[in-house]
């Protein structure tokens, strides 16, 4: 699978209309993914602010159609470089940027670059001379793990121009979790109502045989045609990034990240419609098994409490648990690295609805208009 084929795939992904997205079986999961990115960027900005930077220079590497442009606006970015191998996606990102309400006044500067970040030197194309304060790579880095050279080039492009103390954040499939799922499935396949994961070479799945690079799998969500992806073991990602003086700040499976962000990010999660109300007459999952946790939560609620919870169907939750979030920082000194802990998969936590709004919600969250036209996972 060459980067050109990846580009071809993403260039041809149809832009779903608002109505299509609302009717999608994974409507809430997509919104949840989008909320996770918002929370991650929010946390990264706190670290960037600690460096004394209020208006960061940002690189959004493998930015797709620019689904995070609004988030960059909210961070108060000074300049954002958006790079992707898919030219049509970059064109759409640039068009979106131009329709943003403040354009061309009072909005961050931006550069849109078409580049295969596994082969080309991005630095040759970047116009701004300042180093980056923040780099974001959402749902994309693993494509570069097709082979070692590609992964190394991609990571160099990602963090090579990051300033000392600068932050690198991202999301990617959790290789351990995926291998676990396909090993426990049938003939290298894991499937539920919303996602299907197939590991291509089943004989590689025996203990110790999954290669570090080129471990190809197919991940299809909501029956969308997918393009092949590659496992990126987090310990390997960490190792490769350490060669660029990057130190690990955190890594969490999505389940763990959601639990951590539920209190500070609850208001935003509700406004972004990241949870489905249970019970309701038009649930996206069609069997009782999809909502056993939510049902148990409802049954445990005392009297005089509204009998509604916010939840995700079991299948969406299983799919979301296939991903992790991470944050690294370029070392300022020779501080000792923080060690990553093995991510533990928690159960879906249904959230009682109609309670007082969380007071600690970030003021930025109120400003997000949830009209995102391209929520991830794309
Ligand atoms: C799942 S999409 C994520 C898009 C965006 N980051 C988001 O969160 O919505 C993966 C993106 O990675 C891009 N990509 C894959 N391989 C790439 C490469 N070699 N160089 C640059 N971009 C690449 C694809 O074109 C696609 O836009």
Swiss-Prot record:
Basic and acidic residues: bias regions: 335-347, 356-378
Domain (mRNA cap 0 methyltransferase): residue spans on this chain: 24-331
GO (cellular component) term, any one: nucleus
Transmembrane segment boundaries: none
PROSITE patterns: RNA_CAP0_MT
Major subcellular site: nucleus
Enzyme class: transferase
CDD domains to which the protein is assigned, alphabetical: AdoMet_MTases
Binding site for S-adenosyl-L-methionine: 37, 62, 84, 116, 138, 143
Any Pfam family: mRNA_G-N7_MeTrfase
Reaction(s) catalysed (UniProt annotation): a 5'-end (5'-triphosphoguanosine)-ribonucleoside in mRNA + S-adenosyl-L-methionine = a 5'-end (N(7)-methyl 5'-triphosphoguanosine)-ribonucleoside in mRNA + S-adenosyl-L-homocysteine
EC number(s) per entry: 2.1.1.56
Binding site for mRNA: 33-34
Gene Ontology biological process terms in this record: 7-methylguanosine mRNA capping
Superkingdom: Eukaryota
Compartments reported by the entry: Nucleus
Region annotation Disordered: where it falls in the sequence: 335-378
Keywords, comma-separated and alphabetical: Methyltransferase, mRNA capping, mRNA processing, Nucleus, RNA-binding, S-adenosyl-L-methionine, Transferase
Annotated site location: mRNA cap binding: 65, 71, 96, 142, 229, 323
Gene Ontology molecular function, alphabetical: mRNA 5'-cap (guanine-N7-)-methyltransferase activity; RNA binding
Signal peptide range in chain numbering: none
Reported function: mRNA-capping methyltransferase that methylates the N7 position of the added guanosine to the 5'-cap structure of mRNAs. Binds RNA containing 5'-terminal GpppC.
PANTHER family tied to this protein: MRNA CAP GUANINE-N7 METHYLTRANSFERASE, MRNA GUANINE-7- METHYLTRANSFERASE
UniProt similarity note: Belongs to the class I-like SAM-binding methyltransferase superfamily. mRNA cap 0 methyltransferase family.
Name listed for the protein in its UniProt record: mRNA cap guanine-N(7) methyltransferase
